[in-house]
A protein has these predicted regions:
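Acidic, Ser/Pro/Thr-rich low-complexity regulatory regions
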Residues: 1-113
Length: 113
């Protein structure tokens, strides 16, 4: 119960950050997808949340952290171009889905109560 409340709050924060553009779209979508899987797998499969799954799957082969730094510049640029294309294609839908999570799918924040 406590963990679910914490996960819901983390999801609300991530969705807000994605909407406020405080977080890169791809990173935000991946984080939301992973948290949704832990919070409520059924909600994660909801059609309104599919964009997060799509962005996760489209980028899961991309190296992260030290492996990213180890890539040569042309490889990094190729991945960055892919990110830009994905962002253009999915930004509006990801923003709508984040707004839906905040307004309808997730319990209201304790602060708002």
């Amino acid at each position: 119960e406590k963990q679910q409340t914490a996960l819901a709050e983390d999801l609300r924060i991530l969705a807000s950050c994605l909407l406020d553009e405080q977080l890169p779209l791809i990173e935000g979508a991946i984080r939301i997808k992973v948290l949704l899987d832990n919070y409520d797998a059924e909600l994660g499969q909801h059609p309104r949340c599919q964009v997060f799954q799509q962005l996760f799957e489209a980028t899961e082969q991309v190296p992260t952290h030290a492996a990213w730094k180890a890539l040569d510049k042309s490889e990094r640029r190729r991945h960055e171009a892919q990110f830009s294309a994905l962002e253009l294609r999915h930004k509006a839908e990801a923003r709508r889905s984040a707004r839906w999570l905040l307004d309808e799918a997730l319990p209201k924040s304790r602060d708002a109560a």
